[in-house]
Amino acid sequence: MYAVVQVRGVVNTRRDIKETLKMLRLHHINHCVIVPETPEYLGMIRKAKDFVAFGEVDAATLATILTTRGRLTGNKPLTEEYVKSATSYGSIEEFASALVNGEVRMKDVPELKPVLRMHPPRKGYKTTKRTYTQGGALGYYGTEINDLLIKMR
């Protein structure tokens, strides 16, 4: 699973990139989505790579951000009790590990919003105009996206 976080805004941006971010459900800065590792999603992420940060998320980090930032319809927080009653998993950690392994999707939890509205990272982004390999905050992070997500929890 990939975690994709929008880092830059879309003012004065090409229409195809705006539409790609819209298809990824990224409408605002610091919003995060969890997408499967399919060629279709990877193509969309590569098209928007200059506006997003992305990488492979692990189960522990995903469980943390689902606990802190997961929301249900009506802006209610995602709780252990709701996951137990709505799915066959006993906790958010079990659901997160199944999600990372590809056994389940986000939409399998009814009323779970697909977008996680994250806090800006503590200590800030390095720079939003350079890629991660150049010392910035854009593009492919690999497994180090987990550090960014923990800073944004």
UniProtKB/Swiss-Prot annotation:
Classification via CDD domains: Ribosomal_L7_archeal_euk
Gene Ontology CC terms: cytosolic large ribosomal subunit
SUPFAM superfamilies: Ribosomal protein L30p/L7e
Superkingdom of this protein's organism: Archaea
Sorted UniProt keywords: Ribonucleoprotein, Ribosomal protein
Molecular-function GO terms, alphabetical: RNA binding; structural constituent of ribosome
GO biological process, alphabetically ordered: maturation of LSU-rRNA from tricistronic rRNA transcript (SSU-rRNA, 5.8S rRNA, LSU-rRNA); translation
Assigned protein family: Belongs to the universal ribosomal protein uL30 family.
Subunit description: Part of the 50S ribosomal subunit.
Descriptive protein name: Large ribosomal subunit protein uL30
Source organism of this protein record: Methanocorpusculum labreanum (strain ATCC 43576 / DSM 4855 / Z)
